Amino acid sequence: MSIQKIWAREILDSRGNPTVEVDLHTAKGLFRAAVPSGASTGIYEALELRDGDKQRYLGKGVLKAVDHINSTIAPALISSGLSVVEQEKLDNLMLELDGTENKSKFGANAILGVSLAVCKAGAAEKDLPLYRHIAQLAGNSDLILPVPAFNVINGGSHAGNKLAMQEFMILPVGAESFRDAMRLGAEVYHTLKGVIKDKYGKDATNVGDEGGFAPNILENSEALELVKEAIDKAGYTEKMVIGMDVAASEFYRDGKYDLDFKSPADPSRCITGDQLGALYQDFVRNYPVVSIEDPFDQDDWAAWSKFTANVGIQIVGDDLTVTNPKRIERAVEEKACNCLLLKVNQIGSVTEAIQACKLAQENGWGVMVSHRSGETEDTFIADLVVGLCTGQIKTGAPCRSERLAKYNQLMRIEEELGEEARFAGHNFRNPSVL
């Protein structure tokens, strides 16, 4: 079924910043998609087009991207006569029209908005749930419910506290199902709230951009201690492990790392990549840390490779790989990490996101699907993670509706699958063995 109409508009994301929403019409109805936006963005990400007009939304408007859709992309896709089930052809047509390496002509936020809407329309055209349509696009016969990685303590660029490292996550790998994982996660989250309140007072339980608590602590080990205490207190020591997103590019200064980067600069307190690696080794020894994302700067390749060779845990590339096949290929060659963080808006189309996922999986990597810190009520990534069988997703704490929208959709998918539903659990790094 060909496209009848495409219309884009500017809406607001969960941080109150403008983002792009796209309505796509076919004979089957209206299909709507909204684009997320990151705070700690890798310099190699596809370009998110902002207006730059300081008189409007402090320069963050997206009317240019919206206009590119309404004036150029929409007429081209409609006149092509392509069916919405032809995802790759439609995505490639947009990439050709843009013609740049990093989507800087139209903006990745313009192309992705249309690409997501096409995918939703394609599923309806086939009379399939979105996750099954995505599985078909990826050539997958399996469907797997992921382990959620709940970001329960926020730091870095996501919170106004002193904490340098950006996310401290809990993964309920011992849960029996996704629904059970949600319960475990929520119970530990509420227990953690009590632990933080008792230690630092009620104002320390304010939440960051992704719904995690943001107590004003400086030591990253203190955050790990709080999470461990909450897990133990909730009674889930055997069922829950810890993940971290360090987002080290945010505090990389002149070849060294500043773990107090939110205070006035002081070169004397900066540490080397080796020293930072030793700190992580301590974390892994002392806490049930099984996954560390972006432990080093996006260009500190030597530190990545050395560290990954020396630890037996999951090392996730985000700013390093930016869901980009060329960066992934280099990371595979240099053995820099062993898991890809998949963010559709880093690369800017559904087709390229699927290709990036397959490339990582073919090289024996894990894949974790991810939200952005600036989110919307769109639930596309919930269906994406099931269809791509990656076995793990991070989309914030069990708090804030733009986060819960994804988790709730995953519970619905699990319910819909019934007996067919399989939960990744302890195999979250390699769910294909299920």
Swiss-Prot record:
Covalent cross-link site, Glycyl lysine isopeptide (Lys-Gly) (interchain with G-Cter in SUMO2): 202
Family annotation (Gene3D superfamilies): Enolase-like C-terminal domain (3.20.20.120), Enolase-like, N-terminal domain (3.30.390.10)
Catalytic reaction annotation: (2R)-2-phosphoglycerate = phosphoenolpyruvate + H2O
Protein species of origin: Rattus norvegicus
UniProt binding sites for substrate: 158, 167, 293, 318, 370-373, 394
Protein name: Gamma-enolase
Keywords: Acetylation, Cell membrane, Cytoplasm, Glycolysis, Hydroxylation, Isopeptide bond, Lyase, Magnesium, Membrane, Metal-binding, Phosphoprotein, Ubl conjugation
Highest taxon of source: Eukaryota
Residues annotated to bind Mg(2+) 1: 40
SUPFAM superfamilies per the UniProt record, alphabetical: Enolase C-terminal domain-like (SSF51604), Enolase N-terminal domain-like (SSF54826)
Residues where N6-(2-hydroxyisobutyryl)lysine is found: 233
